[in-house]
Design a protein with these regions (language model features):
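N-terminal amphipathic/basic-hydrophobic helices that include classical n-h-c signal peptides
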Residues: 1-13
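Intrinsic disorder/low-complexity signature
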Residues: 3-6, 47, 164
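N-terminal strand-loop-strand beta-hairpin
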Residues: 11-132, 167-201
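Short loop/beta submotifs within extracellular cysteine-rich repeat domains
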Residues: 41-42, 154-156
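A contiguous pocket-lining binding segment that forms or flanks enzyme active sites
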Residues: 136-141
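A hydrophobic, small-residue-rich beta->alpha segment in the mid-to-C-terminal subdomain
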Residues: 152, 158-164
Length: 201
C-alpha cells in the first residue's frame, strides 16, 4: 500500500511549483547578469545533499512522484512532489515541511517501509527579485540555473539572462544524471562529487 495516498488525501493544501532549468557555461557571467537584472543574493553558496526515497518496487517512481529529504547547510526539509505537468515549463504540486532532525526522519521513513533510491549533491546560491527566485547550482555533472515563479515571470527572467526557450530543461536531476551516465558510460550510481569522480576515472 502506498502510504503517501493517505498523506495526499488529508486536508493539507499543496502549493504549486513552476520552474525551468538551463545549463550554465560560466558562473561569473550568470551572476553578473542576475545583478544587472535587479536580483539580490538571498543565500550564499551553500552545500546541499538530497536523498530520494521510494517503496519496494519503485512505487513513487512509477507514478512520477517524489519524496525527498534535503539537507541545505544546517537545515533539513522533507518534500513530497506530485506527478505534475510538463510543457514549456515544469509544474508540480508539492508539500514541504522543515525537519529538526534529519537522521531521525531518515529512520522514520525507513521504519515506514521507504528506502533511499537516489542521492544527489550540489552547491547552491539563491537569488530573488521579490517576484520569483533563481538558483545557481554547481553539480557533479555541470552547472545549472533554475528559474522558479509564474510562467510569464520565468520567460521574462530567462530573456533578461539571455536564455532562449530552446535552452529550457524541464527534467529533474535524477533524469539528467541518468542521461549523463549513458553519455559518459560512467559507473557512478549517485550524483555526488566523490562518487562521480571515482566512477568517471
Amino acid at each position: 500500500m502506498n502510504r503517501l495516498l493517505i498523506f495526499r488525501n488529508t486536508l493539507f493544501s499543496m502549493s504549486s511549483e513552476t520552474e525551468v532549468k538551463f545549463r550554465v557555461g560560466d558562473l561569473r557571467t550568470v551572476r553578473r547578469k542576475l545583478h544587472a537584472a535587479g536580483f539580490r543574493l538571498k543565500t550564499r553558496r551553500t552545500h546541499e545533499m538530497n536523498t530520494l526515497y521510494d517503496l519496494p518496487g519503485g512505487v513513487l517512481r512509477k507514478h512520477r512522484e517524489l519524496l525527498r529529504l534535503r539537507q541545505y547547510g544546517s537545515e533539513w526539509k522533507l518534500t513530497f512532489k506530485s506527478k505534475g505537468k510538463i510543457g514549456r515549463h515544469s509544474t508540480r504540486d508539492e508539500l514541504e515541511t522543515g525537519v529538526s532532525d534529519g537522521k531521525l526522519m531518515d529512520a522514520i521513513l525507513r521504519a515506514l517501509g521507504y528506502s533511499p533510491s537516489f542521492r544527489y549533491e550540489k552547491f547552491r546560491q539563491e537569488w530573488t527579485d521579490s517576484k520569483g527566485e533563481v538558483v545557481v547550482d554547481e553539480t557533479p555533472i555541470g552547472n545549472f540555473c533554475e528559474i522558479e515563479g509564474s510562467s510569464r515571470w520565468i520567460d521574462a527572467t530567462a530573456k533578461k539572462l539571455g536564455v532562449n526557450h530552446a535552452d529550457y530543461i524541464t527534467k529533474n536531476y535524477a533524469t539528467l544524471f541518468a542521461e549523463w551516465r549513458r553519455e559518459t558510460r560512467s559507473r557512478a550510481q549517485e550524483m555526488t562529487f566523490q562518487v562521480v569522480k571515482k566512477g568517471h576515472n
